[in-house]
Amino acid sequence: MDRETFNRWLASYGSAWTGRDPGAAASLYADDATYQVTPFDEPLRGRAAIYEYWSGVARTEEKIQFEYEILAVTAEHGIARWWASFVRVPPGLATKLDGIFLISLDSAGRCRSLREWWHKRQ
């Protein structure tokens, strides 16, 4: 992986999230990708499961903002810090997240694995 590819993937991830587009989000992942939302949850497995997860996000979050900063890129992984804010619906609860991604991409630039650690303030 190189920095440019990782940056492009993160920008596309942010666009899919802020655009509330589960299809665009799922298209960023390999067919057999894993997505671990928190370190204590079992990872989602496969693009269909990731699509279902992002469908829920699209239904329950509005006014989404997303930013990121690349911290490191190796041949195997990219690490980024990210920030997001949104309004959870219902009940209209303002939410801020601050997190870290550990991401592995395949040769086509699709995510093979994503692990994240984040904190929430509401």
Predicted stretch roles:
Residues 14, 39, 70-72:
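Structured beta->alpha junctions
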Residues 32-34, 94:
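Short hydrophobic/aromatic segments of transmembrane alpha-helices and their interfaces
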